[in-house]
Amino acid sequence: GHIICIMPEGVKMRLLEIKGLPVSVLIDFVHRHGGILGPAHPCGEKYLSFTNTGRFYKSPELIKRFDFIEAFNACESAESNEGARKLAEKYKKPGIGGSDAHRPDCIGTGYTILPERVTCETELIALIRSKAAIEAGGVLYGKTAKDKMGPAHKILTYSFWFYNKGGALLKKRKRTLKGKIENPATPIDPIEIPYLHNIKKQK
């Protein structure tokens, strides 16, 4: 699925630009470098949205390790956004909104209202980690390729799957090499300790 990552200003990691990073590794990597992350349109199309991936079916508890959830996406359906909102409420995660704009007239159709002024990525990261009251919303765009194609958009969904899988395979060697440099084995990030403690209690 698509994942939104927010890193502190000045932190640019090449590994984040390479396709095919397993989500559990991505979560560790982003947290280790001081960032936050969450699933985009989590209840949307198969393969492109976290709750409709094989990884979620195998390990649904991974949702607890995200810092926020995109609760509104202007290019998704009302049903998809409602599912995302309920997901954020269920796991007590801050919900953000976005336009997911691929065309100029879609920009600004989704929004996130913060309870205080934010001037940089570090301040935004701190605010979301504090689980501050954040409001997300907007208006549905309704003019995406998916909307225009109707039922035939499933062809587009599967083509994206092949594109992403192919890209991941082609980038495997580069991902491994960059991983050794940017993501070496290190002690567990303190932010993960509550999650790991809960998993231990469940066992």
Give a label for each model feature:
Residues 17-21:
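Glycine-rich anion/phosphate-binding loops
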Residues 1-14, 24-28, 45-203:
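Charged catalytic cores and adjacent phosphate/nucleic-acid-binding surfaces used
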Residues 34-35, 92:
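Residue-level detector of structured alpha->beta connecting loops
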